[in-house]
Amino acid sequence: MYQIPVLSPSGRRELAADLPAEINPHLLWEVVRWQLAKRRRGTASTKTRGEVAYSGRKIWPQKHTGRARHGDIGAPIFVGGGVVFGPKPRDYSYTLPKKVRKKGLAMAVADRAREGKLLLVEAFAGVNGKTKEFLAWAKEAGLDGSESVLLVTGNELVRRAARNLPWVVTLAPEGLNVYDIVRTERLVMDLDAWEVFQNRIGGEA
């Protein structure tokens, strides 16, 4: 059981959260690898010797020239020739069990909670879409830009106010994922986003 700090207009309080007690780094690595594989475009493509724009004519006779024997100029041995075993467009994605994905997400959030890097927010008071408003709020919340922050909220105005800052990554609650959690140093979520997260891991943590 973790005690998560909650920031509200009236002050700070704590919320008890049932998250995994043990963090499995390999499981987190598996989920991140799966995420990044899904993001790959897979459009790299090379031409084989049959696809390059050259004639298939033998460049000189097989014998009696004193030179090495060759076929057509599109052979891989020549500059500008085809490529042997080069990449072709492919899909790099693969399936990962849903239970593993849920556990990975729960563990990533638990890791931030264990480090004291998770902050829940009841309301972003005074933030109405302007970056300077978010900066003022962040200063009061103890976020000074020295650490990268993953901000998860369904409030479009808050996301708009924060997205311009190089040290903030903004996500909607449905977009919370292991990769963005582990690549940033702090995790800030509003209570609605926390509820969405709890529903996502529902009983599998």
From Swiss-Prot:
Bilayer-crossing regions: none
GO cellular component: ribonucleoprotein complex; ribosome
Gene Ontology terms describing biological process: translation
InterPro entries: Ribosomal_uL4, Ribosomal_uL4-like, Ribosomal_uL4_dom_sf
Statement: the UniProt record of this protein carries the keyword Transmembrane helix: no
UniProt GO MF annotations: rRNA binding; structural constituent of ribosome
Keyword line: Ribonucleoprotein, Ribosomal protein, RNA-binding, rRNA-binding
Domain of life, per lineage: Bacteria
Keyword rRNA-binding: yes
NCBIfam families xrefs: rplD_bact
Entry function: One of the primary rRNA binding proteins, this protein initially binds near the 5'-end of the 23S rRNA. It is important during the early stages of 50S assembly. It makes multiple contacts with different domains of the 23S rRNA in the assembled 50S subunit and ribosome.
Subunit structure: Part of the 50S ribosomal subunit.
Protein family (similarity comment): Belongs to the universal ribosomal protein uL4 family.
HAMAP family xrefs: Ribosomal_uL4_B
Full protein name: Large ribosomal subunit protein uL4
Organism, scientific name: Thermus thermophilus (strain ATCC BAA-163 / DSM 7039 / HB27)
